């Protein structure tokens, strides 16, 4: 008989092990860095994201002994730390949305193929979307961006923000309704 295959340790197990051996935290970092970075970059822009993500993982490392797995998983805990740090950088985020609403997003100076591949309708929509996001309340914007950028589940968003599961659905529904009302209707053929 062969032994059953070993399963990879869970995030909570790695975090607990990292209390005794700090090097074990590297696995948590490796598993979640890209997702946290994508979320923060979408909120604050790529330049601020590097600093905020570094601060997120430094905070998580410092608080790893206090992590309580009975209150939720490591992934939403990390996104909660990131969301709290984003709140400290909120003025930058709001300014960014206002600038995007006025001038559109920075154009990627990529090659000709990249420019051709860019969707005309997305380019046209970006200032309107930025304006609509800036108009949402902070609470509604947090839920929308945790869903859209971090791709968290309703349950994970509830854990991150410390709100009931049903409130996530209510805020998301309200925010989507406001965004739909604020955005131009899709145009046929684009």
Name the predicted role of every residue range.
Residues 130-145, 150-167, 178:
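Helix-turn-helix DNA-binding module
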Residues 51-58, 62, 72-84:
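Structural recognition of an alpha-helix C-terminal capping motif at a helix-to-coil junction
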